[in-house]
Amino acid sequence: MSAPTENCCARRDRVLVFGEEENAQKGGNVAADLRQTDKTTISRHAERGSYDREAAYAILDEGMVAHVGFNSDDGVIVIPMTYARLGDELVLHGAVASRWLSSFEQGRPVSVCVTLLDGLVLAQSAFSHSMNYRSIVCFGVATVVNDEAGKSEAFKAFLDHHIPGRWEDSRQPDAKESGATIVLSVPIDEASIKVRSCPPQDSEKDMGLGYWTGVIPLELTPGEAIPYPAMEPGKDVPDYVRNYARPIRG
């Protein structure tokens, strides 16, 4: 048996089809749409990288948590934050009382990372185990959204991103709640994505060892909605709750 191709190529959908690996490799990287710089250029397994804007949007639209990194007087800080995409911008929000976020008033360089985990990859050797994933890293200056119209648009985007349909089915933020919240905007410009979606990449010498190899697919799936005990009885579960699902875009 010949050894599999060493370089595992990226595919934009989350469906693992071993036979399509070869065809995916022929495509190479998509033409740069996001801005490629020294920081965003992928050097290791460059064949998994892309600067395609639509592919980046698909990852961001499916993800739910971003890890935001920035320098502070106390060193490098990384904070998990909820986010939403508004066109070609990411909006993030947190509490005005946060000592970290209050320092963003004049704008601050950040890196934003979103990762979707699609599978655990089991190889013959412990060293060759891996994960299938889709990820984006974005660099830019985070600026504070101060106008009320912009903040209101961001609040709606946050809820629509995580629970489509809920904004119209809930009380909107009042002035006090808006004043207690800081909204940050980061351009989706200097960024790159990286995707792994393929079987184990065992070396030829390990292929005959006889261990089970393959992929354990992983995905985020909702369970049955749990009603709040203090809610008025007889309330029907909304369709957007009963049919909740994250977007999956190829």
Question: Predicted regions span which residues?
Answer:
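Short, low-complexity intrinsically disordered segments enriched in A/P/G/S/L with frequent Arg
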Residues: 2-3
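C-terminal edge-of-domain segments
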Residues: 8-9, 18-40, 146, 150-250
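An N-terminal domain-cap segment
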Residues: 33-91, 102
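A generic structural signal for short beta-strands and their flanking turns/coil linkers
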Residues: 64, 79, 86-88, 106-110, ...
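General beta-strand recognition
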Residues: 89-91, 111, 194
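A generic structural motif
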Residues: 90-94, 184-185
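Short, structured beta-strand-loop surface elements
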Residues: 97-157
